[in-house]
Amino acid sequence: MLRNRLFKTPHQTGFQWRLGAPATGITIRNQPIRSYSGLRGNFLIDKRLSPVKFNKYSPSDIVFYNIGSSRLYSTETPTPSKVKEAPKQVAAEETKPTTVVKKPSIWQRVKGGVLHFWDGTKLLGVEIKISSKLVYKMAVGYELTRRESRQLTRTLKDIGRLVPFSVFVVVPFAELLLPIAVKLFPNLLPSTFEDAKDKEAKKAQLRKTRNEVSNMLRSTLKSGKFTFSNETRESKEFRDFFQKVRTSGQSPSREELIEVCKYFKDDITLDNLSRAQLVAMCRYMNLNAFGTDPLLRYNIRHRMRQIRRDDRAIYIEGINSLSIPELFNACNSRGIRTQGLSPAKLKEELSVWLDMRIKHGIPSVILMLSNAFSYGYNEGTYDSRWDALQDTLASIPDELYHETVVDMPTKQVSNKERLEILREQEELIEEEAEHVAEHPDLAKKQTEENKATSKPAVSAKSPESNIPKNERK
């Protein structure tokens, strides 16, 4: 109990606690105690001024703290002899005036903001200078490495963001509205003007969004049983797999899982996801979730193409060539959980992703759905990414399953099955048409973006003999 660690002074005025260093405050169960004084490395709590009954508290209830320091103080039981023999250094330290951290004034904050924007401007100028050399390197016929390609892409995006930012510079007194505009549109400024606090806030918001999306996907993906038919034997392997995972609950082999995953191509998967699931995927991938269903599918396909090119570049150069920030960004862009994981664990997760994508040829949309499906679970729920992938396939919508069966090259589908599948597709088309009619502006924007051609990113200048042929296109 606390009374075993505290002792009364000769004048019976209070209690003392031996400290490892001078403290500037005391709290008991998060309640500050204002009546205390320092005495040769000890604290004297005057119970005449602060009516606190110590007998009902445990030692963990009392916290001594020091403003500006996170040092933990010792709670050894003092004796009167130790108090008398206290070192002179401790007494000298206690006589020093305590420094109180003051909040910066308005002028200091304005000055700090101006310096931050000035440093960001100089940093942007250096990036433009570096990127101009990379453009010249491309013009003479050399290929860029992954790091150089990402540097050039980031600089081009920052230059594009300067167009709306220049309005606040040209229009008189428009800079007064800049903080409000940045608050409403966080991506308005180039990346060089973003401070560490804003980056951490965005990461925390993305983690929160991904947890919500993961829970929503698990609740919306249907878990009902498929209707299996034994009329043909060409797709027996495909049907046996889903009978195992959804009817009998058996675990298929990894070879069966790989073969079945290859049937779920990216276009088929995206075309048979509902709007709620498409919006959830866009939010999970940190994309714009506004627009028609075709626009959402286009955004997801475009991001997946970028990830596939990046996969090939990392596979050629090796995971060990990535720095720690690049490793975190690579895992984060693929929907892999990064919070609380060591760099060694992240390298393992990224290596599994590359093996699934490059070596085994599993479609990227199914892998992203698998990451989103398992993101909300605690670490250790799945033994491996393969188990999460199996659960994802066991929860796919019925429309996606039926469309995949029809799309199989060796599958002979009866007219009755074709009629049912066509009705399902007709319902999806009608829902999309209704949404386009309600939002004509979004449909026009989607048409314009489809006409725009995306620039192919450059990969490293290395032999691609280790990449399968289906991944070189």
From Swiss-Prot:
Residues 1-73 form a transit peptide. Disulfide bonds: none annotated. Pfam families: LETM1_RBD (PF07766). Its main location: mitochondrion. GO terms for biological process: mitochondrial translation. Residues 205-398 form the Letm1 RBD domain. One of its GO terms (molecular function) is ribosome binding. Residues 183-473 are mitochondrial matrix. Keywords: Membrane, Mitochondrion, Mitochondrion inner membrane, Transit peptide, Transmembrane, Transmembrane helix. InterPro entries: LETM1-like_RBD, LETM1/MDM38-like. It is found in: Mitochondrion inner membrane. Residues 74-161 are mitochondrial intermembrane. The chain crosses the membrane at residues 162-182. It is a single-pass membrane protein. Residues 434-452 have a biased composition (Basic and acidic residues). Residues 430-473 are annotated as: Disordered. GO terms for cellular component: matrix side of mitochondrial inner membrane; mitochondrial inner membrane; mitochondrion. Residues 462-473 have a biased composition (Polar residues). Involved in mitochondrial potassium homeostasis through the mitochondrial K(+)/H(+) exchange regulation. This is LETM1 domain-containing protein mdm28, mitochondrial. It comes from Schizosaccharomyces pombe (strain 972 / ATCC 24843). The gene is mdm28.
